[in-house]
Amino acid sequence: MRQLKITKQVTNRDTPSLDKYLHEIGKVELITADEEVELAKRIREGDQKALNKLINANLRFVVSVSKQYQNQGLSLPDLINEGNLGLIKAAQRFDETRGFKFISYAVWWIRQSILQALAEQARIVRLPLNKIGSINKINKTLSTLEQQFEREPSAEEVAAELECSPKDIKESLKNSGRHVSMDAPLSSSEDGTLYDVLDSKDSPT
């Protein structure tokens, strides 16, 4: 069976129509719990094909979760796009040694990604146009740097790219409902991240 290639670009607006997308993911074979374990091991070793397979097999679940958040400010395709981002993060972080199924872990990331997007949309519609322009510019830079670094950039890295202060970046992200990456370095000279500083009891690791 031809595998549907899923990467971060799945969230771009030039994806196929929703009906075609749903048809494509409906053809992807589901995987067993044992296969999840094997894929997780391969993902930790840097196997991109294993990552794609784990993501592909769970795309239908993202659609189901996304439907629960309709009529709250985002279209169903946009909700699915955001949910897919959460699914990708879950697949990259999944630890099979903890003994639970992948989807039980992934649902938290899927919902958080959708909820953050809904919160961002709700805040943006209340912002002045000049601030919306700044936020859009920052978001584009965030996306570009994320592809370049293969991780979410820090506020300092975004500020350096846009030639402004990290404080301005953080304030704009706060206004839009987005947050600085928990995984990004605290600064260019430090290896620690916010995950190292905070006791993250409310999120899976």
Label each region the model flagged.
Residues 12-22, 119, 133-205:
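Charged, low-cysteine interdomain linkers and short loop/connector segments
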Residues 94, 125-127, 182, 197-198:
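Short clusters of hydrophobic/aromatic residues that line enzyme substrate/ligand-binding pockets
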